[in-house]
Amino acid sequence: MDLQKEIIENKEEFYNLAIEYYNNIDKKHRKECLITPKSISILIDHQFFTTPCVEIKLELIDQDYQKNIGHYFLYIDEKKDFVDEFLV
């Protein structure tokens, strides 16, 4: 299946995968917060990752102040295998 078509048809599955990976982060590095799906991108050329790969971005929101406190990025390959992740 075409990667773009698969993402469009199954975007909730991709976001849920990113949330699952975020929840596996060591608790001392993970904040209890509201998680909001932000974007899904296909990277076709990247300096560090084998491409094409998928970047899934989640927004992290402080529950008390309703304020953005960071972002979580998950990178997966076409088979949905883990490539990398960043918490900023």
Predicted regions located by residue number:
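Short, non-transmembrane alpha-helical segments in secretory-pathway proteins
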Residues: 1-43
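Exposed beta-strand-loop-beta-strand "reactive/processing" segments of non-cytosolic proteins
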Residues: 33-74
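Short non-domain terminal segments
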Residues: 12, 46-47, 84
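A short, surface-exposed interaction/processing loop segment used at functional sites
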Residues: 69-88
